Amino acid sequence: MSGAVAEARALVGVPFRLHGRSPERGLDCVGLAALVLKRAAPEGYGLRSGDEGRASEWLRAAGLRRVEAAREGDLALVRPGPLQLHLMIVVSGGHVHAHAGVGRVVEMPGPSPWPVIGYWRAE
């Protein structure tokens, strides 16, 4: 198990908070990814625009590279709705992500229920 996966699983149960950046106050998907991958999170972003190009720019600026096949610890950029993007951490048998509907960070078994746009890896 990678360090990113262990870190992600340790955060399961942390409350969801839009633009959240700390386990004490809550996390959103960007805050979770930044914390787990030890990267700076963008400020003033909006994933509800559905702009894949802009999301890709942020991911590259954070030192991540796009990969064809996912492995544990990678980020999955997914599209839960027509104008919405979301980040999830790939773990064995599923994903860890900040789930707004459930109100906390969760581990979700199985493949993504949403279309996967791409996978990103920290180097």
Annotate the PLM regions:
Residues 15-18, 66:
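Short secondary-structure junctions and interdomain/linker hinges
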Residues 17-20, 44:
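Short, hydrophobic secondary-structure boundary micro-motifs
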Residues 2, 41-105, 109-110, 122-123:
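...with weaker cross-activation on analogous glycine-rich loops/strands in unrelated enzymes
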Residues 20-38:
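Active-site nucleophilic cysteine motif
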Residues 1-15, 109-123:
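Non-catalytic ligand/cofactor/substrate-binding and regulatory segments of enzyme domains
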